[in-house]
Amino acid sequence: MKHFDYLVNEQLKTMERLLYLQSELERCQDIEQELDSLDEGAELAALREEMALMKINLRKIQKTFENQTEEVIRSYQEVHLNTI
């Protein structure tokens, strides 16, 4: 059961990273709209680069979360089968 608890704890940490990055991306999208309306081309290009990197990181974290979910399920099933 300790392993299961550890996995769940790690998954919660990943979820926190995921939510943080999503909120940062949303914040950048708001700034993107402002810069676009102000016709700030150079700053807008730099922001879009940063957003592209954030999206890559977000996909990596989402994949990690999916893998952790599968591992948590396997661990739970192992614990459950051992108690039957």
Place the predicted regions along the sequence by residue.
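N-terminal acidic leader/helix
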Residues: M1-E34
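Non-transmembrane, amphipathic alpha-helical segments
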Residues: Y6, E10-K13, Y20, D39, ...
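Low-complexity, flexible helical/coil segments
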Residues: L12, I61-T64, I84
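Short E/K-rich amphipathic alpha-helical oligomerization segments
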Residues: S23-A52
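Short, charged/polar low-complexity linear motifs in solvent-exposed/disordered segments
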Residues: Q33, A46, K63-T64, E78-V79
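Amphipathic alpha-helical coiled-coil segments
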Residues: M54-I73
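Long amphipathic alpha-helical coiled-coil segments
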Residues: Q68-I84
